[in-house]
Design a protein with these regions (language model features):
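Flexible, charged surface loops at secondary-structure boundaries
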Residues: 31-36, 70-78, 101
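Generic detector of well-ordered alpha-helical segments enriched in charged/polar residues
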Residues: 52, 56-59, 63, 93, ...
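N-terminal "first-domain core" detector
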Residues: 1-51, 60-62
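Short acidic DE-rich linear segments
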Residues: 156-177
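Polybasic, proline/glycine-rich intrinsically disordered low-complexity segments
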Residues: 90-156
Length: 177
């Protein structure tokens, strides 16, 4: 398939708020899906120590700066933070990727490429893998990651969500029997 279109957002300074790593690199891109955007924030800290100290701060910034401005639930659910960090140990990767607050997180043990085409290839293949995983696992796990949305303005949307959760629960129950 053809490479999907990526749009780059130039203003990433706000995403660096409270991050104590002067040299951290952040790239914020949006990828057009059917009728919405997937938001992807790529980041590389100076070293593993810096990643450990600062990753939560970046997650908070993304939540404040990116997610709070989005109106569509589907876009709010499709925010990814990709941490590029060579030599990072398993426990740190696990810790970050299991964190369900507000965005989905991926840790890649490699340098973040300066070349945009290479970066896009890595991101596309990674997101594609995740999509396959999600389709295979079929469980409804995204709701607890959405605690940060304090109120749904739209009752209809809440009903949709409830319906979705019920369907997931129903499927899970039927699989057991």
């Amino acid at each position: 398939g053809k490479m999907r279109d990526y749009n780059y957002i130039d203003d990433v300074e706000v995403l660096k708020d409270n991050i104590l790593d002067e040299d951290c690199k952040i790239i914020y891109m949006k990828q057009k899906a059917e009728d919405y955007f997937i938001h992807i924030i790529c980041c590389q800290f100076t070293d593993v120590e810096s990643l450990k100290m600062n990753w939560k701060e970046l997650v908070n910034n993304v939540s404040e700066v990116v997610q709070k401005r989005l109106n569509d639930l589907i876009e709010i659910y499709n925010v990814y933070i990709v941490f590029f960090q060579p030599q990072v140990e398993d426990s740190v990767v696990y810790n970050i990727e299991q964190n369900k607050y507000s965005s989905r997180k991926i840790v890649l043990r490699k340098e973040m490429p300066d070349d945009k085409t290479k970066l896009e290839q890595i991101i596309s293949s990674k997101l594609f893998d995740l999509k396959i995983e999600k389709e295979n696992s079929e469980q409804c796990c995204f709701t607890d990651s959405m605690d940060f949305i304090t109120s749904f303005n739209d009752e209809n949307c809440e009903k949709e969500l409830e319906k979705y959760i019920e369907e997931c629960a129903w499927e899970a129950m039927n699989e057991k029997n």
